[in-house]
């Protein structure tokens, strides 16, 4: 009984709860024994955690979830890869907010970048607190937005993206700690055919932007895995499948 000496009551949905309580000499509560309120057992969840992910409490989801950020310069296949994975496997994807709000990259205003950063931050915070799927795909992130900010407004303090005038109000150190980070970063290199849909920088500018992005990630202590393969989807898909296999193994082995 050494490991149970501080336990006063045992709670569960099966009859063995009573037997354990009698043996230990403590109180017990048996609830929903006929599974009228919760029509699923822990054994079912353990047997297929992907299918029954929604039944896990947020704290457990946060332990098992894996956040994958796909970053890189323009026209490198980030959105295409994320959308294909979302459609194929049903994992939640956080979209590239800038593409939703900006007509052309080089015409992006400071106010729009501030809005993009804020929306991205709120979305990432939400999926961090209660992950809706075991794999969360990020089509870029807040660091990419910060990189655009520093690239377009070269002499403006980075903290202005949060609405502060200078570092006397909010420091870059505070900004560093505020940024939400993924578990894995893939950086798509600018070595595939460039497609300009009318909203992007020129190909030469996109390559300069790529270097700026990598410097931004380095500033935040992140060294993304560089992807140069032409079939980028396959690279990320294999990584996702390996992570899911590891998750299932880990979940099943826990008592």
Regions found by a protein language model. Name each.
Residues 47-68, 219-255:
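Charged phosphate-binding loop/patch that engages nucleotide di/tri-phosphates or the phosphate backbone
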Residues 74:
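The conserved Walker
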Residues 115-180:
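Glycine-rich phosphate-binding loop used to anchor ATP phosphates in small-molecule kinases
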Residues 153-232, 248:
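A glycine- and Lys/Arg-enriched "phosphate-lid" helix/loop adjacent to the NTP-binding pocket
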Residues 83-128:
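Conserved substrate/cofactor phosphate-moiety recognition/catalytic segment
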Residues 78:
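Conserved lysine of the Walker
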Residues 1-67, 71:
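Classical nucleotidyltransferase
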């Amino acid at each position: 009984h050494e490991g149970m000496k501080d336990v006063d009551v045992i709670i569960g949905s099966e009859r063995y709860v009573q037997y354990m309580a009698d043996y230990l000499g403590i109180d017990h509560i048996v609830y929903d024994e006929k599974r009228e309120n919760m029509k699923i057992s822990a054994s079912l969840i353990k047997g297929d955690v992907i299918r029954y992910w929604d039944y896990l409490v947020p704290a457990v989801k946060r332990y098992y979830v894996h956040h994958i950020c796909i970053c890189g310069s323009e026209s490198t296949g980030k959105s295409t890869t994320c959308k294909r994975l979302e459609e194929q496997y049903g994992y939640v994807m956080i979209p590239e907010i800038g593409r939703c709000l900006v007509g052309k990259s080089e015409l992006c205003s400071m106010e729009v970048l501030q809005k993009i950063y804020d929306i991205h931050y709120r979305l990432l915070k939400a999926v961090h607190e209660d992950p809706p799927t075991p794999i969360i795909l990020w089509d870029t992130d807040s660091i990419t937005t910060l990189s655009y900010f520093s690239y377009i407004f070269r002499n403006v303090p980075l903290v202005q993206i949060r609405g502060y005038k200078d570092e006397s109000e909010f420091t870059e150190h505070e900004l560093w700690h505020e940024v939400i980070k993924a578990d894995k970063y893939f950086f798509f290199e600018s070595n595939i055919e460039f497609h300009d849909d009318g909203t992007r920088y020129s190909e030469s500018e996109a390559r300069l932007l790529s270097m700026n992005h990598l410097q931004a990630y380095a500033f935040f202590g992140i060294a993304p895995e560089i992807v140069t393969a032409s079939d980028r989807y396959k690279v990320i898909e294999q990584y996702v499948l390996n992570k899911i296999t590891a998750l299932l193994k880990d979940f099943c082995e826990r008592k």
